[in-house]
UniProtKB/Swiss-Prot annotation:
Swiss-Prot/TrEMBL keywords: Acetylation, Cytoplasm, Nucleus, Phosphoprotein
UniProt keyword Phosphoprotein, yes or no: yes
Biological processes annotated in GO: cell surface receptor protein tyrosine kinase signaling pathway; Ras protein signal transduction
Protein name per UniProt: Docking protein 1
Organism of this sequence: Bos taurus
PANTHER family reported in the protein's UniProt record: DOCKING PROTEIN 1, DOCKING PROTEIN RELATED
One Pfam family this sequence matches: PH
Lineage: Eukaryota, Metazoa, Chordata, Craniata, Vertebrata
Sequence ranges assigned to domain PH in this UniProt record: 4-119
Modified residues annotated as Phosphoserine in this record: S48, S269, S291, S416, S462
GO cellular component, one term: nucleus
SUBUNIT field: Interacts with RasGAP, INPP5D/SHIP1 and ABL1. Interacts directly with phosphorylated ITGB3. Interacts with SRMS (via the SH2 and SH3 domains).
Entry-annotated residues carrying Phosphotyrosine: Y296, Y337, Y362, Y377, Y398, Y409, Y451
């Protein structure tokens, strides 16, 4: 029969229908032996573990944890402990995570004993040994300045189905390690105790990250080894992962600023040495006798100017104050640009006498040629309200000439009046010869109209076809009209 290494009361957190609650159990830890594997068993009460864990009472469902499947054992802090003064710790396996709690001394003892049996070859000791072994002269110690001060933490997660996860072939449970400069996804090996790195995401290539009560998610950039996309992990430690990532990014920013400050100090010291002349100048390259100096044999700032006839500047002294040299005579009294003006004038005269050459096609760059004058009909204007203008010139007040004497604009000229119609022709007059054949009256002149009066009949309401009313004939006698 197997002997228990440790046993005692433990609180086990369970979740049903979205509600978390603590359940008090009796836990028994068995080591690895020829009769069985190392395991942790849970019972309802203390009496159930008698007889090597084969009690008659009912055992809790699926509450046997094999330590070979254990990934990590670490103390954690919870918001609502099962009782005051209780300390919690998490036991992660390849399938799920278990949250356990006990009083503070018992919780530390459980963590230490579980680490001893689950990781026999690992560094599970929480406290330093009482008698540390003496180091020999040949052994080497790690440099604390070189090794990172923050090792990071590991979390057991389950990959959710996303486009990026399917592209990378991720499914199932993995271990997500939060390191100093990146996130690393570890896959348990064949022995379930060795974690193999599968993917990693540097913090500088993460676009965004966030957490929820039951998951942790981040969006990777296109330069990540996994490619762009969103990765979602189901875990109850989403808040812990988020805080660990945030702390790592903050540490990386501080280290980056410190590195930039050291670079600035180095650059300043280098410039100071150059300014003080402490840097030794490089010796000039040796030249073979008789060989001409190459064009690029020396740097630009160290090229030597060949000695000229005179080192004086052209405008170092005024023209009048330049002393005349012997043998030059009175030729130096000419103006400075005298020869230049004559040379230009001769060129202009020759250009006028010779035939002008045809201008090249690409005389001026595009966009710099002078704009051509627009013609009269280049900008036509569409006439509007032509029916209103009626082909008359539109004259407005501000377009008329201004008269300064009257402080007003000139009045437009009057328009031509409407032409009067021609006078109607007069009635036909009888000639004197016709008058003789008449009634024989000579009293009236021939200017009398033939129809002098036309009266409207009131009784019948119609016009007479002849003379209705009294008609005066040529003799001067009035007669009644007859129809």
């Amino acid at each position: 029969m197997d002997g228990a290494v440790m046993e005692g009361p433990l609180f086990l957190q369970s979740q049903r229908f979205g509600t978390k609650r603590w359940r008090k159990t009796w836990a028994v830890l068995y080591p690895a032996s020829p009769h069985g594997v190392a395991r942790l068993e849970f019972f309802d009460h203390k009496g159930s573990s008698s007889g090597g864990g084969r009690g008659s009472s009912r055992r809790l469902d699926c509450k046997v944890i094999r330590l070979a499947e254990c990934v990590s054992v670490a103390p954690v802090a919870v918001e609502s402990p099962p009782e005051p003064g209780a300390a919690s710790f998490r036991l992660d396996t390849a399938q799920r995570s278990h949250l356990l709690a006990a009083d503070a001394p018992s919780s530390a003892a459980w963590v230490q004993t579980l680490c001893q049996n689950a990781f026999p070859k690992g560094s599970w000791a929480l406290a330093p040994a009482e008698n540390p072994p003496k180091l020999s002269a040949l052994e080497m110690l790690e440099n604390s300045l070189y090794s990172p001060s923050w090792e990071g933490s590991q979390f057991w997660v389950t990959v959710q189905k996303t486009e990026a996860a399917e592209r990378c072939g991720l499914h199932g449970s993995y271990v997500l390690r939060v390191e100093a400069e990146r996130l690393t996804l570890l896959a348990p090996g064949a022995q379930r105790q060795i974690l193999e790195p599968l993917l990693f995401w540097p913090y500088t290539l993460l676009r965004r990250y966030g957490r929820d009560k039951v998951m942790f998610s981040f969006e990777a950039g296109r330069r990540c080894p996994s490619g762009p996309g969103t990765f979602t992990f189901q875990t109850a430690q989403g808040n812990d992962i988020f805080q660990a990532v945030e702390t790592a990014i903050h540490r990386q920013k501080i280290q980056g600023k410190a590195g930039q400050g050291q670079d600035v100090l180095r650059a300043d010291s280098h410039e100071g040495e150059v300014a003080d002349g402490k840097l030794a100048s490089l010796a000039a390259p040796l030249e073979l006798p008789g060989s001409p100096p190459a064009l690029y044999s020396e740097p630009l700032d160290s090229l030597r100017i060949p000695p000229g006839p005179s080192q004086d500047s052209l405008y170092s002294d005024p023209l009048d104050s330049t002393p005349a040299r012997a043998g030059e005579g009175t030729q130096l009294k000419k103006a400075l640009y005298w020869d230049l003006c004559e040379h230009v004038q001769q060129k202009l005269i020759k250009a006028k006498l010779t035939d002008p050459k045809e201008d090249p096609i690409y005389d001026e760059p595009e966009g710099l040629a002078p704009a051509t004058l627009r013609g009269l009909y280049d900008l036509p204007q569409e006439p509007k309200d032509a029916w209103w203008c009626q082909a008359r010139v539109k004259e407005e007040g501000y377009e008329l000439p201004y008269n300064p004497a009257m402080d007003d604009y000139a009045v437009p000229p009057p328009r031509s009046t409407k032409p009067f119609p021609a006078p109607k022709p007069q009635g036909l007059a009888l000639s004197e010869s016709g008058a003789a054949t008449g009634s024989g009256s000579q009293g009236h002149s021939s200017d009398t109209a033939l129809y002098s009066q036309v009266q409207k009949s009131g009784a019948s309401g119609s016009w007479d076809c002849g003379l209705s009313g009294v008609v005066t004939d040529r003799t001067g006698a009035k007669s009644e009209g007859s129809t």
